[in-house]
């Protein structure tokens, strides 16, 4: 029996004994429910290949930008953590760096998740993690990862993973998704998600080449803006045919102002020629966001929006290590005015599901919850990126529930590249919901019977309903 605090059955539950008892009872309704992950960043190929994980660093450290950014902020070179395929250190040396700096994670959500992974996935007491024990734990993990029951497919069964959505380029052939769907020996559903960002952001390197190829490959012989729209429609349908239920959009901001056909064509031509201004690039992206919502009215894909992040804030790090290394920084923006064109035209359609995410907690109560509290199409996305941590998740409930109730919630989103953190993240969400609902019961605001119904809906029914799973 582990003596680690990470194994305590009351972790994250209320400190007040009476309220904690209620939370314990509520947790029993959901703790063992299957995991539904409608948005994340794992690769379907991992399950097709089903190969043993190479080593602890490759699995747990290098791909997890939540984890590596903490070390980088303390002066650790990302190359020494083998980020972006770099090999500044061996996997064992990178692990030693992590273990030697384990104290940096105290109080962070990342530290909590890693502790939960150690305790509940690998059976290793996380209190042992230190510079002195780094090699011993590395060797223990290496032995565990060599076992057949720790290959990707076996872990999916162990995690009780029912649905996992990936994030995919519109021109992806989705062969791995098709192979998994046709494999009777693999029960989890691995679904693609349409992510067109590479073709909407003119300011990103390679945009013109990618967009030209998209139109050539999927535009049905049409050119220009018409070819662009036709290509997007065709690829969306291809994704739907391969199991997709949603399209994700990592927009710069919330602007959804539509352009006329003529203006869209003009800016597209300038973008392909490399002469578009930044204002025109932003206008093009806003127009595509509106047009994707328009397409949703026909094909039924759920539309999720992740705005307000300055991607690749460190240009030097991007050049050296690539994208998605943890160098994304939030900036302030508003939702009410930006989303008005989209929601004014499509928000009254209850069959259109539009999920709004934010990294700015103040927006939840000021704009996102009021929008979701009026428009039948609008839903409040779960806390994301920097605010999918325990205290912010508790605040999220207080900031939104008074306006929207519980029915306008997306369901929990783990949004992770770290495979073994999935059960830890979902268990965290379940405990946070039990914590919040127990308080409402203790304050005699709802009955415990009603709370038990709500928590099951939040964990299981909400993501199925909102993401049309």
Curated annotation (Swiss-Prot):
Pfam families: UxaC. InterPro entries: Metal_Hydrolase, Uronate_isomerase. Pathway: Carbohydrate metabolism; pentose and glucuronate interconversion. Its EC number is 5.3.1.12. One of its GO terms (molecular function) is glucuronate isomerase activity. Keywords: Isomerase. The keyword Transferase does not apply. It catalyses: D-glucuronate = D-fructuronate; aldehydo-D-galacturonate = keto-D-tagaturonate. It is an enzyme of class 5 (isomerase). PANTHER family: URONATE ISOMERASE. This is Uronate isomerase.
């Amino acid at each position: 029996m582990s003596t680690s605090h990470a194994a305590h059955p009351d972790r994250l539950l209320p400190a007040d004994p009476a309220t904690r008892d209620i939370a314990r009872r509520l947790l029993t309704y959901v703790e063992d429910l299957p995991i539904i992950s409608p948005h994340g960043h794992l690769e379907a190929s991992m399950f097709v290949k089903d190969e043993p994980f190479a080593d602890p660093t490759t699995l747990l450290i290098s791909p997890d930008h939540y984890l590596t950014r903490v070390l980088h902020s303390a002066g650790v070179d990302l190359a020494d953590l083998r980020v972006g395929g770099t090999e500044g250190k061996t996997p064992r040396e990178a692990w030693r760096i992590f273990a030697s700096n384990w104290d940096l994670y105290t109080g962070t959500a990342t530290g909590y998740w890693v502790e939960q992974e150690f305790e509940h996935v690998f059976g290793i007491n996380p209190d042992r993690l230190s510079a002195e024990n780094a090699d011993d734990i590395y060797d223990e993990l290496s032995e565990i990862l060599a076992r057949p029951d720790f290959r990707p497919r076996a872990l999916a069964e162990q995690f009780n993973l029912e649905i996992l959505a990936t994030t995919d380029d519109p021109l992806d052939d989705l062969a791995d998704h098709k192979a998994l769907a046709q494999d009777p020996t693999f029960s989890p559903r691995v679904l693609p998600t349409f992510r067109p960002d590479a073709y909407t952001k003119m300011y990103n390197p390679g945009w013109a080449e990618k967009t030209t190829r998209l139109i050539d490959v999927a535009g049905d012989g049409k050119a220009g803006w018409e070819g662009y729209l036709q290509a997007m429609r065709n690829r969306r349908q291809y994704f739907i045919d391969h199991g997709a239920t949603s399209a994700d959009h990592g927009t710069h901001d919330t602007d959804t102002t539509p352009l006329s056909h003529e203006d869209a064509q003009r800016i597209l031509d300038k973008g392909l020629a490399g002469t578009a201004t930044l204002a025109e690039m932003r206008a093009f992206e806003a127009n595509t966001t509106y047009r994707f919502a328009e397409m949703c009215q026909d094909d039924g894909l759920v539309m999720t929006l992740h705005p307000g992040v300055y991607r690749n804030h460190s240009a030097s790090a991007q050049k050296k290590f690539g994208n998605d290394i943890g160098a994304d920084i939030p900036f302030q923006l508003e939702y009410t005015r930006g989303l008005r064109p989209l929601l004014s035209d499509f928000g009254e359609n209850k069959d259109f599901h539009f999920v709004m995410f934010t990294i700015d907690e103040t927006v939840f109560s000021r704009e996102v919850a009021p929008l979701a509290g009026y428009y039948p199409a609008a839903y409040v996305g779960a806390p994301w990126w920097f605010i999918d941590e325990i205290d912010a998740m508790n605040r999220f409930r207080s900031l939104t529930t008074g306006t929207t109730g519980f029915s306008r919630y997306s369901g929990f989103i783990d949004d992770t590249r770290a495979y073994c953190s999935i059960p830890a993240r979902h268990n965290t969400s379940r405990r946070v919901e039990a914590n919040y609902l127990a308080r409402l019961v203790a304050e005699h605001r709802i009955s415990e019977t009603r709370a038990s119904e709500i928590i099951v809906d939040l964990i299981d029914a909400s993501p199925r309903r909102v993401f049309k799973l």
